[in-house]
Amino acid sequence: ELLFHAVEAVHAVRRMKFGSVLDLGCGTGLAALPFRQFSDWMGGVDLSPAMLMQARGKGLYDRLIESEVLAFLSSEAEIKAGYHLVLAADVFMYLDDLTSVLKAIAQVLASSGQLAFSVETHAGDGVLLRETLRYAHGEAHVRAALAAAGLKLISLDFASTRTEKGVPVLGLIVVAGN
């Protein structure tokens, strides 16, 4: 829902409509739900067959693929796909290197395509591995990774992306484009 509101704010001046949407780490389809009505086509990628089965049951996706995100993005067919919007909600917390995945996403975006993602963050610079085995990415690191991938930052907002033991976990909600 946080990703949806961030993308919606970017499109407040014009009607929000996307030809094709790709949901990376789609899980059960929770992040895709608010976007479905604004897309002509929606695909989802996830490592877990159980999650994909739940997503399939929701009827949101035109295509579901069992794959690791970077492997999927690097396939020749996907490089030619040209997605209008790529979503990655609660996915990049499992990656220490954002630059590689952002470069791969930049390759599959259509002209004027956008990427909306969330990351956990921390007050310092760089990347921090937490006790939870989830990575927290500093704001400067996120900005540098976007620039290295050739993506332009459109919006960056601080928000609690989840709670851990009853305590809100600070995150960033990012929208970028090519």
Residue ranges and their predicted role:
Residues 87:
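A conserved beta-strand element that flanks and buttresses the S-adenosyl-L-methionine
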Residues 1-18:
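Conserved alpha-helix/loop element of class I SAM-dependent methyltransferases that forms part
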Residues 99-111:
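A short glycine-rich, Lys/Arg-flanked "PGG" loop and its adjoining helix->strand segment in the class I
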Residues 20-22, 28-74:
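Class I SAM-dependent methyltransferase SAM/SAH-binding core
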Residues 152-161:
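Conserved S-adenosyl-L-methionine
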Residues 125-141:
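Acceptor-substrate binding/catalytic loop of class I
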Residues 163-178:
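Core SAM-dependent methyltransferase catalytic element
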Residues 112-120:
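Conserved beta-strand signature within the Rossmann-like core of class I S-adenosyl-L-methionine
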